[in-house]
Structures are given as C-alpha cells and as structure tokens.
Amino acid sequence: MKKIAVLTSGGDAPGMNAAVRAVVRYGVRQGLEVIGVRRGYSGLIDGDFVKLEYKDVAGITEKGGTILRTSRCEEFKTEEGRELAAKQIKKHGIEGLVVIGGEGSLTGAHLLYEEHKIPVVGIPATIDNDIGLTDMCIGVDTCLNTVMDAVQKLKDTASSHERAFIVEVMGRHSGYIALMAGLVTGAEAIIVPEIPVDYSQLADRILEERRRGKINSIIIVAEGAASAYTVARHLEYRIGYETRITILGHVQRGGSPTAFDRRLALSMGVEAVDALLDGEVDVMIALQGNKFVRVPIMEALSTKKTIDKKLYEIAHMLS
C-alpha cells in the first residue's frame, strides 16, 4: 500500500483534527502518500482531494472543528453516488480510506467496502457517544466539559433568581451527554430518550425540593427525549411558576478538544493506519477498557448502546 486518503464526515466533533494529524503524520512516517478529502463524502464524489504533507497538519491538534471540512451528503446515500465516489478513489490510485465520523459516516464506509471493495477503516467521532463496541467516541469528553461549564454558570443565575432552568443538550437517540452532565452538575432531573418521563412525578419532585428549602432547579433534557419547550409547558402547568429555557445547541460541537479527546484521537488515527497496512479492513477502531481494538464496522453499528440505568438512578439519588 502506497497511497491512502482520510476524510471527516457528518457532524463535527472536537478532536477530529487531532485524528487527521495522526493519520497524516504516522502515514507519512510509514512511507505513505496521504490525501485529504475535503467536505466528506461530497468531496469524495467530486474529487475534491489535496495531498497532505507533514507540515500541513502542524498546530491543528488543539483546534476544534475539522480542517478538511465536513458535510452531510444525500447523494452518497444512493448507489449511484457511491459508485461515483469509488471511481474517484480508483482514478486517483487511493488504496485505503480512513473515515472519521459517526453512525451515518461509518455506514457509508462499510458500503464502500461491501459494494466496491474499497479498503476502509472507521474512526468513531460523535458527541452523542452512541456507537456500539467502543467506550468513548472522539469529541464526547470535550462536549461534556462544555455542557458542564454552561450548566454551572446557569446554576449561578438560577439560584440568584430562585428559578427552575431547563437545559436542552444534544443527543437524538442517546442520553449519554444529558446523563453525565446531570450527574456531574447535580441536576435535579435528567430526561433521556431511553427512559420515559413522568411529568407529574417530575413536578412533584421539584415541589418537594422547594418545600425542603431548595430555591433553584436544573433539569437537563436530551433533545431526542423532548424539547425544552415541551418540558417547560408540562412543568409550568403542574408547579405553578415560570421556568427558563436554555438550548445549548451547536456550541456543544465546538471548542479546543480536551487532553482526553486529543489522546483518543491521536491513538485511533495511528491504529487506523496500522489496520490498513495490516490488511484488516471494514473495521472500526474502538476503545475497550484501556485498549484500542479493531471491530467490524457493522457489528459496532448494530450493537445498541444505551445509558447505564444504574448510573441514572444514582444521579437522581445524589441530586
């Protein structure tokens, strides 16, 4: 193998740049030519390629986002789109592809291998942390720290005004960020997609806390469980006083990656190049315990990852 490519796809996650840097520098050290694909699968279809040298990735580890840029490509979801992408790969003599992204991106990588035998290796990067068979995905730790910092600041104003704040965080199918943020900030309630919410019970809990002298409440809700506005409407009707809403939105995707995310990304990038050189393809690099392992992409994607319900119970006990 002499020439490989790397792309970032889907929603950006802090640490993607660190992974790109590792793939490029380690690849070059192994005697490979490394090509960067701009704009994810859209760039793959369009042939938007750039050769990346050692110096081109200097100073990017600490930067959020992705220097390669990213996109969500509807055309790639079609067989025709993937065929165009495969033709570009073969036309440019690319012998292996590293895909950095979440569920949709990794599915696309698998399909490239299944349909066109393009050697692919996936690196899980999504703040939702909803990819199976890996303990952590790139970007999760940074996102969690961003949410924690925001909630701590909201607690200051919530206590000053004796209010209930509802904080909506990302997590369409997974409540991981909501759960962990709620646990480490001492939120009074956590609402996640995996566990149905009982609004009457939630209201009773907040009212009981008020009777005990607690003057403020923080409720953290994952976007996939309910919107903050829906939660506010249900609560205000039951508790009889106004709430305030904060939707953190895309700020959760940004920022300089934490030390943990940098180390995770760098290690996964190196392991991805090694996997290609070893001929072990259609796999995803996963963190299991303290070890980096290679697992079949579709096995990872078909393994449902849920929150730790015992931890959920503990979070409410400690609030």
From Swiss-Prot:
pH profile of the protein: Optimum pH is 6.7.
Binding site for Mg(2+): E103
Enzyme Commission number(s) from the entry: 2.7.1.11
Pathway where this protein functions: Carbohydrate degradation; glycolysis; D-glyceraldehyde 3-phosphate and glycerone phosphate from D-glucose: step 3/4
Protein localization: Cytoplasm
The reaction(s) this protein catalyses: beta-D-fructose 6-phosphate + ATP = beta-D-fructose 1,6-bisphosphate + ADP + H(+)
Annotated cofactor note: Mg(2+). Mg(2+) can partially be replaced by Mn(2+) and Fe(2+).
Positions contributing to ATP binding: G11, R72, C73, G102, E103, G104, S105
Documented activity regulation: Allosterically activated by ADP and other diphosphonucleosides, and allosterically inhibited by phosphoenolpyruvate. Strongly inhibited by diphosphate, triphosphate and polyphosphate.
GO cellular component terms listed in the entry, alphabetical order: 6-phosphofructokinase complex
Residues annotated to bind substrate: T126, I127, D128, R163, M170, G171, R172, E223, R244, H250, V251, Q252, R253
GO biological process, one term: canonical glycolysis
Active site, per annotation: D128 (proton acceptor)
Thermal dependence, as annotated: Optimum temperature is 93 degrees Celsius.
GO molecular function: 6-phosphofructokinase activity; ATP binding; fructose-6-phosphate binding; metal ion binding
Alphabetized InterPro entries for the sequence: ATP_PFK, ATP_PFK_prok-type, PFKA_ATP_prok, Phosphofructokinase_CS, Phosphofructokinase_dom, PKF_sf
Binding site for ADP: R21, A22, V23, V24, R25, K155, G186, A187, E188, R212, K214, I215, N216
Cofactor: Mg(2+); Mn(2+); Fe(2+)
Pfam families attached to this UniProt entry: PFK
Major localisation: cytoplasm
Keyword annotations of the record: Allosteric enzyme, ATP-binding, Cytoplasm, Glycolysis, Kinase, Magnesium, Metal-binding, Nucleotide-binding, Transferase
Family of this protein: Belongs to the phosphofructokinase type A (PFKA) family. ATP-dependent PFK group I subfamily. Prokaryotic clade 'B1' sub-subfamily.
Oligomeric and partner information: Homotetramer.
Function: Catalyzes the phosphorylation of D-fructose 6-phosphate to fructose 1,6-bisphosphate by ATP, the first committing step of glycolysis.
NCBIfam families according to UniProt: PFKA_ATP, PRK03202.1
Protein's name according to its UniProt entry: ATP-dependent 6-phosphofructokinase
Source organism (scientific name): Thermotoga maritima (strain ATCC 43589 / DSM 3109 / JCM 10099 / NBRC 100826 / MSB8)
High-level lineage: Bacteria, Thermotogati, Thermotogota, Thermotogae, Thermotogales
